[in-house]
A protein has these predicted regions:
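Short coil/turn segments at secondary-structure boundaries
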Residues: 55, 101-109, 126
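Hydrophobic, well-structured mid-protein blocks that either form specific transmembrane helices
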Residues: 117-154
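A generic structural signal for nonpolar/aromatic side chains embedded in well-ordered alpha-helices
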Residues: 43, 138-139, 159
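An active-site-proximal "capping" alpha-helix that borders the catalytic cofactor pocket
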Residues: 64-68, 108-124
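Divalent metal-dependent phosphate-bond-processing catalytic cores, especially two-metal-ion Mg2+/Mn2+ enzymes
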Residues: 2-26, 49-77, 87, 97, ...
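Short glycine/proline-rich turn/loop motifs
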Residues: 40-49
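His-Asp-centered metal-binding catalytic motifs of divalent-metal-dependent phosphohydrolases/nucleases
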Residues: 78-99, 103, 110, 114, ...
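Basic/hydrophobic alpha-helical interface regions
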Residues: 30-32
Length: 268
C-alpha cells in the first residue's frame, strides 16, 4: 500500500478541528447544567494558554462530554460523569513536555496532578463534598488500564468509556495514525491492532481481520473491552467507517481526504 503523506494529513486534521470545536460547543452547552457549564467555561479559559492544551483537546473534551450525556440518558449512569469527563485531563497542565503525554509516567502524573486541581474547581463551582469525592474517584483512576491496573465501579467505567471512545473518532484516529512514520507505511496494520485492543479475540468485521495469537500478545497491555452497550454500538460503527475509508484509500489522496473530512466530521 502507498505510504500516507503525514505532512499533508496532519494540517488538514488541525484545520478541521478548529471548526468542529465550535460545532460541538453549540451542541453540548445547551444540554449542560449550570455547574457543568461553569466547569467548561473555566476549562476553556485555561485553554487560551496554548501551553496548557494539545491541539485536539477542545474537541476531545466536548465530544467525550457529549458522549457522557448520552450514557447518563441511555445507561442511567451517575450524572457526575459529565463533570468528571470535563475535568479528567487537566493534570496535563502540569506536564512541560506535552509530546510525551502517552508515556506511562505521564499517565500517572496527569492523574495525580489532575485530582487536587479538579477538587478546587469543583468546590469553587458549587459541588458538594460527596459529589467532589465521587468525581475525584473517577478522575484519579481514569487511565489506570494504560498502566496495567483495572478500573472498578460503574461510574468510573462509564467515564473510561467516554474517554476511550474518542480514539475511534476520525480526528483522533488519524492523528494517532500519522503520529509515527511506521504507521503511515502500514495503516491497515495500525487499524488491525486498534481493533484487537477494543475487541480482543472476537470482533464482527470478517475474516480479513483475523485475530492471531501474535497480534493478541502484541496488544495485550491495551486490550480493554467497552463497558456499556451504547459504547459498544458506537465503537462498532466507527470501526466500520475506518475500514471503509481504508478500503477506499481516502487517506492516501489529500483532496479526497479533505472533502471526506469536511463531510464526515459532523456526524461522527
Amino acid at each position: 500500500m502507498k505510504e500516507i503523506n503525514r505532512g499533508a494529513i496532519l494540517p488538514l486534521l488541525k484545520e478541521a478541528a478548529e471548526a468542529y470545536w465550535h460545532q460541538l460547543e453549540e451542541q453540548v452547552t445547551p444540554k449542560l447544567g449550570e455547574r457543568e457549564k461553569s466547569l467548561l467555561d473555566w476549562l476553556f479559559v485555561q485553554y487560551q494558554d496554548e501551553d496548557k492544551k494539545r491541539w485536539y483537546d477542545p474537541c476531545h473534551i466536548l465530544f467525550s462530554t457529549k458522549f457522557a450525556l448520552e450514557l447518563v440518558d441511555k445507561e442511567n449512569l451517575d450524572p457526575l460523569i459529565v463533570a468528571g469527563i470535563i475535568l479528567h485531563d487537566i493534570g496535563y497542565f502540569a506536564l512541560k513536555d506535552k509530546s510525551q503525554w502517552s508515556a506511562k509516567e505521564s499517565r500517572i502524573t496527569h492523574m495525580q496532578e489532575g485530582t487536587p486541581r479538579a477538587a478546587k474547581v469543583l468546590y469553587d463551582n458549587g459541588f458538594t463534598s460527596l459529589e467532589v469525592e465521587k468525581t475525584l474517584g473517577m478522575i484519579s483512576v481514569h487511565d489506570n488500564p494504560y498502566i496495567g491496573i483495572p478500573i472498578q465501579g460503574e461510574a468510573r467505567l462509564g467515564l473510561r468509556d467516554c474517554d476511550r471512545v474518542w480514539v475511534m473518532h476520525m480526528l483522533s484516529f488519524y492523528k494517532d495514525l500519522v503520529s509515527r512514520p511506521e504507521r503511515c507505511k502500514k495503516p491497515r496494520e495500525f487499524l488491525h491492532d486498534r481493533m484487537t485492543q477494543f475487541y480482543g479475540w472476537e470482533h464482527p468485521f470478517g475474516a480479513q481481520w483475523k485475530v492471531t495469537l501474535n497480534r493478541v500478545v502484541k496488544n495485550a497491555e491495551r486490550i480493554e473491552l467497552p463497558r456499556y452497550d451504547v459504547t459498544k454500538e458506537y465503537v462498532t460503527k466507527q470501526f466500520e467507517r475506518r475500514i471503509q475509508e481504508m478500503d477506499d484509500g481516502l487517506v492516501l489522496d489529500e483532496d479526497k481526504f479533505r472533502k471526506h473530512l469536511k463531510n464526515q466530521i459532523g456526524i461522527e
